[in-house]
Amino acid sequence: MKPTTISLLQKYKQEKKRFATITAYDYSFAKLFADEGLNVMLVGDSLGMTVQGHDSTLPVTVADIAYHTAAVRRGAPNCLLLADLPFMAYATPEQAFENAATVMRAGANMVKIEGGEWLVETVQMLTERAVPVCGHLGLTPQSVNIFGGYKVQGRGDEAGDQLLSDALALEAAGAQLLVLECVPVELAKRITEALAIPVIGIGAGNVTDGQILVMHDAFGITGGHIPKFAKNFLAETGDIRAAVRQYMAEVESGVYPGEEHSFH
């Protein structure tokens, strides 16, 4: 099988072909996802909550991300693999480059970082040094203490305009992908249409180019709060492989996420 690349996702955007992505943290699930054709994965700092049992993503380290990235890469050698740079791993461009190099050596194809225009210099530096970047705007979980909880972002004209400005700035700096989390559908549509790069949504309606879910949410094995945007595909199929196929099919057809999973 040919490796999945960012160029393929750019082609999907141009063709208006929706695509599914998912978080992965280990060899076995990564192999299962790849076997079913789900070939874009993220080693997210969400592992702090889903795997390590913390109440936020903040305790996750670069070493944690690198460890899980290597495991996922062994399970899915041809996937397009994104890896989060965790909290305080990119406070300066130089620090970002050093830590990005660590997760890239572990097997990542691209690093994901949370934040807006303040990251422009960092995105430029990484891109110039052959480290592809995925931006992340909206509800950025590493900023939970600033937001005062996990809340929808970008409501109102001023907040929406700022997120659009941030998105355009990240794209101009060289970001090749963007994750939009927990924003109103109307804003997600504006941003997706304004950018040439693919936009992946989570809690952003079905108007983005792609979707991502934390795998534990997709299979209904979360220990606590279930996000509004989550759907338990395993409950409907009773089989993990069938659940993966249904998730992909519903994303590609625009059935998921539905109105009940979206914000306004």
From Swiss-Prot:
Coiled coil: none annotated. The keyword Magnesium applies. Its main location: cytoplasm. Binds 1 Mg(2+) ion per subunit. Can also use Mn(2+), Co(2+) and Zn(2+) to a lesser extent. It catalyses: 3-methyl-2-oxobutanoate + (6R)-5,10-methylene-5,6,7,8-tetrahydrofolate + H2O = 2-dehydropantoate + (6S)-5,6,7,8-tetrahydrofolate. It comes from the Bacteria. Homodecamer; pentamer of dimers. Catalyzes the reversible reaction in which hydroxymethyl group from 5,10-methylenetetrahydrofolate is transferred onto alpha-ketoisovalerate to form ketopantoate. The active site is at E181 (proton acceptor). This is 3-methyl-2-oxobutanoate hydroxymethyltransferase. Pfam families: Pantoate_transf (PF02548). Keywords: Cytoplasm, Magnesium, Metal-binding, Pantothenate biosynthesis, Transferase. GO terms for molecular function: 3-methyl-2-oxobutanoate hydroxymethyltransferase activity; identical protein binding; magnesium ion binding. Pathway: Cofactor biosynthesis; (R)-pantothenate biosynthesis; (R)-pantoate from 3-methyl-2-oxobutanoate: step 1/2. Mg(2+) binds at D45, D84, E114. It is found in: Cytoplasm. Inhibited by isovalerate, pyruvate, 3-methyl-2-butanone, and valine. Partially inhibited by formaldehyde and tetrahydrofolate below or near the KM value. Also inhibited by later intermediates pantoate, pantothenate and coenzyme A. It comes from Escherichia coli (strain K12). Its cofactor is Mg(2+); Mn(2+); Co(2+); Zn(2+). Optimum temperature is 70-80 degrees Celsius. InterPro entries: Pantoate_hydroxy_MeTrfase, Pyrv/PenolPyrv_kinase-like_dom, Pyrv_kinase-like_dom_sf. The lineage of its organism: Bacteria, Pseudomonadati, Pseudomonadota, Gammaproteobacteria, Enterobacterales. CDD domains: KPHMT-like. 3-methyl-2-oxobutanoate binds at D45, S46, D84, K112.
